[in-house]
């Protein structure tokens, strides 16, 4: 991944020596020692003397067209191995379903060509034909008939296998020593491909459904409910080999994803849009929902992938078809409608979809149209688009497994998968233990907190409250108003309850100046119109300093984005949105915590923070940076990403932050505009933070994969260093050279920990649990931490990677700092799973992305691959009155 910055930014200058992730200095010792189990399984490797041979595979249809479906390719290659075992020297191999095939020894020749005849060549294992533009498969739109001369159930495939490279098996030993070379990572990749191939075959052999979600290594039948929505959850599992400081291990975990409910396409659209009459279908939304899904036709059994919809209805949509001249003359071209074609050629009188658009399953310049009523969605297709609030909550609910249940399921997965019987693994001398790995862990004590009345607050099980304590730095709420977009909420009563609760917590809340109710006729207007109308009422008097906004619904409310933009960009008004369903003291307290933080107050402080006793940080002026990137909804690769950097304020505090944001290219995880040599200071995202600070820095980054660590060090850190040098030149201070510590936090991993209590029941690990040996990297400095209490499901630890440390933290000091940063999150009275700066960066990026409703702009189109990339729009600047605030809290 490259930085796509302007000419003159650091990546174009003379490059310093390439930085690599630092090696481990040692292990932590603080905390109470405990023993845990983890979902890693020990792997023994008895053979290191051979080579993995890498071959390039081309699978083609008889006419030379490439086969693109992974499922078809896998079945063809399986058939090839069965048919041509002697020509392949009896070799077992691992095939990735695309272009890569790996063996544990050389084939007889460097290049092989085979013809494979399949009686059942669909990706689902059922009879089908290749997608054709011709009318022979029941899909009008072309004249290609060659592939239909052979009986439908029999297909010929041409397979070419050619030598590409070889890697020594001894490379596995290198990666276990922490030497991550290209050869060593390739060797592990071969082993992972072997597992995926085994899981794919296992799924085909045992499942009644024809395919499985490609995002998971396998899937487990949990039953498909007959009623319900257009998307359902599907439970599968993930497995991968991991190098650790105690040897090679296999990480196995349960995964859950949303899949599209199989069945008639029209029923799917009715469920998707929550309507009962097909004539009410919004076809713009339908096009977006259906794109790239696979369907099977009821009249031929053929499978296709949807690329869009026809412009006209089935009754009116025309296409050209060639008619052969029986007298030997030239062919004639006739233009017919899809409706007429099916009536004449297939004797099908279309009734249910004659006046609806057709599905286009062809190519952009060569469409192939099929009526909706003849199409069924095939099973087990992963839903890759954005989920609604209800769908997300359903997925979370279905994903939850308590530790006891998860361990039971994982034991079953390992037993049923029977990896030790996989021929390729046996040929490589690899065996996998069936027992969960035991690891040593430590539990760090919760830090003490200080309240406004001088009392110590003791967190128990990662939680505390303000029932008997006051906020430590309350900010008076004055000159404030309530705006009410909800017809269900009594805003006057809500304001009175909020005032009463605030006074109990030591947060003085003046009586509200006014409650503005939305005019009754505005409810059906566009969100922007409703917001503008409300602001006309709001600004009829003096500008308030704070606005409490009551929304009509929780999450994904159309009003939220325009309202936030108007308040924070145009007028500089601090605002808090809410959509209460049940108002009680705890709910109001949580709202007040957010309001106080946004107005510049603090709810609590760490005792060591107040006493300036944090190792290193309290002695040397320090800024803590948190970085995150918010991407568009799944399936929206044409939507710009929003990057955010939050920086700590008022050293020696580590509890107060501000944010800077910018847009960048879609799906780009690296922040490519931390520093650029451009004239407009507003474009330099890191400059604002550095102008407030003039010494050493600690940085925390989220959402980065292990393969991107070098980019964090050599792109992002390099830009920050260059920004510091530029600022030092501006200040004429050649001696200013801050020291950096860079830590990456990963949540998207599959490691889980389990503890057995006195009654021999498997439970979640206690908050403050840290693991830095046994399953960590063999060389690099990393550790797992569960700072929070897992109340529901199985606790997911955060995996921290210390990439760079010029401040020379001890392992204990660094782990305690990370633990402490999980207790300074001003929005709640619980320890959080990550560190507060990263969570704030995530909130800032997600909130600011709503200002311009980027997803709405993209929802009209479907991001066709042939369209030129859109220019990245700039975000509007925050109003100066809120720029330094924790507006994102």
From Swiss-Prot:
Keywords: RNA-mediated gene silencing. Residues 546-853 form the Piwi domain. One of its GO terms (biological process) is regulatory ncRNA-mediated gene silencing. Residues 1-26, 119-150, 857-878 are annotated as: Disordered. Residues 122-132 have a biased composition (Low complexity). Coiled coil: none annotated. Transmembrane segments: none annotated. Residues 264-379 form the PAZ domain. One of its GO terms (cellular component) is cytoplasm. GO terms for molecular function: RNA binding; RNA endonuclease activity. It comes from the Eukaryota. InterPro entries: ArgoL1 (IPR014811), ArgoL2 (IPR032472), Argonaute_N (IPR032474), PAZ_dom (IPR003100), PAZ_dom_sf (IPR036085), Piwi (IPR003165), Piwi_ago-like (IPR045246), RNaseH-like_sf (IPR012337). Belongs to the argonaute family. Ago subfamily. Probably involved in the RNA silencing pathway. May bind to short RNAs such as microRNAs (miRNAs) or short interfering RNAs (siRNAs), and represses the translation of mRNAs which are complementary to them. This is Protein argonaute 15. It comes from Oryza sativa subsp. japonica (Rice).
């Amino acid at each position: 991944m490259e930085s796509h910055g302007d000419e003159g930014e650091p990546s174009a200058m003379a490059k310093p020596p390439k930085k690599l992730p630092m090696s481990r200095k040692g292990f932590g010792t603080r905390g109470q020692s405990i023993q845990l189990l983890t979902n890693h399984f020990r792997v023994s490797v008895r053979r290191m003397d051979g080579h993995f041979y890498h071959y390039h595979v081309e699978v083609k249809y008889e006419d030379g067209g490439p086969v693109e479906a992974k499922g078809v390719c896998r079945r063809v290659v399986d058939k090839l191995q069965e048919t041509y075992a002697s020509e392949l020297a009896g070799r077992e191999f691992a095939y990735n379903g695309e272009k890569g095939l790996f063996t544990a020894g050389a084939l007889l020749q460097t290049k092989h060509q085979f013809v494979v005849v399949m009686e059942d060549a669909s990706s689902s294992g059922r009879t089908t034909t290749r997608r054709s533009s011709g009318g022979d498969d029941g899909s009008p739109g072309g004249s290609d008939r060659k592939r239909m001369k052979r009986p439908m159930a029999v297909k010929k495939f041409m397979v070419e296998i050619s030598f590409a490279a070889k890697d020594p098996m001894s490379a596995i030993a290198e990666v276990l020593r922490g030497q991550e070379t290209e050869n060593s990572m390739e060797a592990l990749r071969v082993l992972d491909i072997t597992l995926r191939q085994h899981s794919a075959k296992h799924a085909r052999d045992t499942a009644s459904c024809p395919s499985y979600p490609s995002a998971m290594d396998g899937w487990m039948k949990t039953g498909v409910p007959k009623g319900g929505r257009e998307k359902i959850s599907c439970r599968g599992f993930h497995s991968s080999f991991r190098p650790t400081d105690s040897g090679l291990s296999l990480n196995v975990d349960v995964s859950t994803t949303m899949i599209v409910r199989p069945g008639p396409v029209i029923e799917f659209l009715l469920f998707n849009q929550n309507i009962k009459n097909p004539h009410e279908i919004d076809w713009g939304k339908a096009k977006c929902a259906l794109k790239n899904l696979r369907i099977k036709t009821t009249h031929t059994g053929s499978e296709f992938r949807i690329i869009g919809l026809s412009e006209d209805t089935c009754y009116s949509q025309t296409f050209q078809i060639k008619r052969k001249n029986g007298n030997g003359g030239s062919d004639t071209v006739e233009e017919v409608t899809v409706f007429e074609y099916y009536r004449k050629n297939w004797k099908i009188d279309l009734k249910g979809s004659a006046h609806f658009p057709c599905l286009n399953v062809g190519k952009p310049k060569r469409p192939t149209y099929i009526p909706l009523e003849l199409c069924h969605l095939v099973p087990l297709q992963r839903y890759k688009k954005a989920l609604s609030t209800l769908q997300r909550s359903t997925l979370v609910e279905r994903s939850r497994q308590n530790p006891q249940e998860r361990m039971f399921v994982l034991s079953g997965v390992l037993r049923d998968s029977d990896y030790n019987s996989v021929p390729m693994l046996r040929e490589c001398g690899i065996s996998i233990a069936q027992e969960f790995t035991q690891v040593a862990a430590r539990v760090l004590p919760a830090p003490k907190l200080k309240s406004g009345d001088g009392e110590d607050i003791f967190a128990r099980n990662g939680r505390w409250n303000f029932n008997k304590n006051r906020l430590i730095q309350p900010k008076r709420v004055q000159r404030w108003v309530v705006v009410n977009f909800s017809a269900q909420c009594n805003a006057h009563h809500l304001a009175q309850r909020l005032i009463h609760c605030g006074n109990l917590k030591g947060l003085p809340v003046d009586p509200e100046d006014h409650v503005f109710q939305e005019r009754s006729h505005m409810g059906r207007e566009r969100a922007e119109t409703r917001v503008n109308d409300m602001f006309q009422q709001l600004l009829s008097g003096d500008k308030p300093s704070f606005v409490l906004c009551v929304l009509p619904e929780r999450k994904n409310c159309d009003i939220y984005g325009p309202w936030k933009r108007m308040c924070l960009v145009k007028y500089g008004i601090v605002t808090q949105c809410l959509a209460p369903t049940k108002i009680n003291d705890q709910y109001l307290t949580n709202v007040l915590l957010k309001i106080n933080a946004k107005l510049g107050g603090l709810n609590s402080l760490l005792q060591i923070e107040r006493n300036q006793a944090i190792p290193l940080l309290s002695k040397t002026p320090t800024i803590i940076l948190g970085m995150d990137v918010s991407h568009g909804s799944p399936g929206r690769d044409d939507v710009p990403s929003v990057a955010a950097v939050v920086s700590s304020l008022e050293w020696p505090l580590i509890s107060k932050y501000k944010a800077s944001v910018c847009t960048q290219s879609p799906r780009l995880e690296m922040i490519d505009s931390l520093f650029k040599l451009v004239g407009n200071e507003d474009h330099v995202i890191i400059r604002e933070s550095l102008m407030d600070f003039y010494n050493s820095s600690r940085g925390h980054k989220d959402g980065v994969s292990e393969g991107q660590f070098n980019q964090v060090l050599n792109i992002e850190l390099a830009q920050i260093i260059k920004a510091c040098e530029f600022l030092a030149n501006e200040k004429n201070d050649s001696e200013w050279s801050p020291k950096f510590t860079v830590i990456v936090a990963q949540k998207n991993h599959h490691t889980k920990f389990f503890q057995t209590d006195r009654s021999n029941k498997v439970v979640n690990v206690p908050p403050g649990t840290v693991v830095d040996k046994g399953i960590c990297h063999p060389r690099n400095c990393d550790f797992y931490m569960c700072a929070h209490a897992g109340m529901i499901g199985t606790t997911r630890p955060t995996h921290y990677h210390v990439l760079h440390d010029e401040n020379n933290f001890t392992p204990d000091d660094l782990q305690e700092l990370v633990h402490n940063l999980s207790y300074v999150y001003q929005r709640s009275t619980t320890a959080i799973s990550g560190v507060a700066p990263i969570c704030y960066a995530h909130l800032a990026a997600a909130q600011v992305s709503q200002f311009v409703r980027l997803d709405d702009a993209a929802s009209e189109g479907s991001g066709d691959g042939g369209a030129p990339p859109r220019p990245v729009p700039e975000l509007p600047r925050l109003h100066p009155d809120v720029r330094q605030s924790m507006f994102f809290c």
